[in-house]
Curated annotation (Swiss-Prot):
The keyword Ubl conjugation applies. Belongs to the sorting nexin family. This is Sorting nexin-3. The modification N-acetylalanine is found at residue 2. It comes from Homo sapiens (Human). Residues 147-162 are annotated as: Binds predominantly to PtdIns(P5) and weaker to PtdIns(P3) abd PtdIns(P4). A 1,2-diacyl-sn-glycero-3-phospho-(1D-myo-inositol-3-phosphate) binds at residues 70, 72, 95, 118. Its main location: other. It is found in: Early endosome; Cytoplasmic vesicle, Phagosome. The lineage of its organism: Eukaryota, Metazoa, Chordata, Craniata, Vertebrata. The modification Phosphoserine is found at residue 72. Pfam families: PX. The modification Omega-N-methylarginine is found at residue 43.
Amino acid sequence: MAETVADTRRLITKPQNLNDAYGPPSNFLEIDVSNPQTVGVGRGRFTTYEIRVKTNLPIFKLKESTVRRRYSDFEWLRSELERESKVVVPPLPGKAFLRQLPFRGDDGIFDDNFIEERKQGLEQFINKVAGHPLAQNERCLHMFLQDEIIDKSYTPSKIRHA
């Protein structure tokens, strides 16, 4: 019984103030996938998504960044992580081959509903991946999230804490 009282006292010795209760979390990583834009014509047509990152994790060089990525960039990231890290990489939302067939009654992979579903799936994917401590050390993840252009000829390596 005495142990319980001591434990309770230890918990209430420091009163919480408003800054503690409503201040920013000690460590955070927020990634939003938004603002899909379809560009190009014919077979050269594709959709890009805005990737916005806000973080205070010291491993990231930028505390806020915005880049645009297409589905094939997510595929590249996934294959790099599978090849170079010990992280179990979640699946991407499906490729939607049937939506690419000609003579469909809708816009196929450029249909607004499909793009919205894919956007949500890509956001879930990147948040799961980037939230993994081992993945946060991979250079390919940092390039994907924060570099305007992905250097696909990079040398795979780990990021060291700043």
